[in-house]
Curated annotation (Swiss-Prot):
Belongs to the 'GDSL' lipolytic enzyme family. Residues 1-17 form the signal peptide. This is Rhamnogalacturonan acetylesterase. Plays a key role in the degradation of rhamnogalacturonan in the cell wall. Acts in synergy together with rhamnogalacturonase A (RGase A) and rhamnogalacturonase B (RGase B). Disulfide bonds join 105-113, 231-249. Keywords: Disulfide bond, Glycoprotein, Hydrolase, Signal. Its EC number is 3.1.1.86. It comes from the Eukaryota. It is an enzyme of class 3 (hydrolase). Optimum pH is 6.0. The active site is at 26 (nucleophile), 209, 212. The gene is rha1. InterPro entries: GDSL (IPR001087), RhgT-like (IPR037459), SGNH_hydro_sf (IPR036514).
Length: 250
């Protein structure tokens, strides 16, 4: 009597069943700002025992990402134990007097502004409010949320190192505190490694302007994010495949 051979069973480690979703702008997105640049989100998967879904979109702010339903789209598919990393700031400034659809309402709390954009009346929230609302969407699904400060523009652009954080760095930290989620000071960790690398190297990372990085630069920016994760003990550390990254803890 022949017995059927049992196929071997393979089980994925629990970390591999975890998904990390990214929400951001061109500095995080695939193909960055175009012309051969790339966003740092494209390099995270190399260091994680988790699936990475890069939902960053060029040209977006916290406001426009919200208006287009992109946070909702992530919330529709995220499951308990997944991560969502949110990083905006580059496109959130400007004036509402000539509304470009991206500028947030000025302030740090529940302030609201009103505008007509693309023929539609819009109630505009502050930058922290958009991030807090997004965080609540994801935590309600059991996801682990990390609010990250934006990356710096080229601090060596003038030939002299200049560290000048935008207000959105502080706002991201405030939003994380109010929402009760984790915060990564990506700005400071990128700035620190840029200062160490020096003028010539860092300038080579910005082939088209002072904002968008080359693939090599984007990988440095990704590693700086993970250095911050390791140094601050952020929960994402549990799915890292290495904890050895250049730079010092701040």
């Amino acid at each position: 009597m022949k017995t059927a051979a049992l196929a071997p069973l393979f089980f994925l480690p629990s970390a591999l069943a975890t998904t990390v979703y990214l929400a951001g702008d061109s500095t995080m997105a695939k193909n960055g700002g175009g012309s051969g640049t790339n966003g740092w989100g494209e390099y995270l998967a190399s260091y994680l025992s988790a699936t990475v879904v890069n939902d960053a979109v060029a040209g977006r702010s916290a406001r426009s990402y919200t208006r287009e339903g992109r946070f909702e789209n992530i919330a529709d598919v995220v499951t308990a134990g997944d991560y969502v990393i949110v990083e905006f700031g580059h496109n959130d400034g400007g004036s509402l007097s000539t509304d470009n659809g991206r500028t947030d309402c000025s302030g740090t709390g529940a302030e609201v502004c009103y505008s007509v954009y693309d023929g539609v009346n819009e109630t505009i929230l502050t930058f922290p409010a958009y991030l807090e609302n997004a965080a609540k969407l994801f935590t309600a699904k059991g996801a682990k949320v990390i609010l990250s400060s934006q990356t710096p523009n080229n601090p060596w652009e003038t030939g002299t190192f200049v560290n000048s954080p935008t207000r959105f760095v502080e706002y991201a930290e405030l939003a994380a505190e109010v929402a009760g989620v984790e915060y990564v000071d990506h700005w400071s960790y990128v700035d620190s490694i840029y200062e160490t690398l020096g003028n010539a190297t860092v300038n080579s990372y910005f082939p088209i302007d002072h904002t968008h990085t080359s693939p090599a630069g984007a990988e440095v920016v990704a590693e700086a994010f993970l250095k911050a994760v390791v140094c601050t003990g952020t929960s994402l550390k549990s799915v890292l495949t290495t904890t050895s990254f250049e730079g010092t803890c701040l």
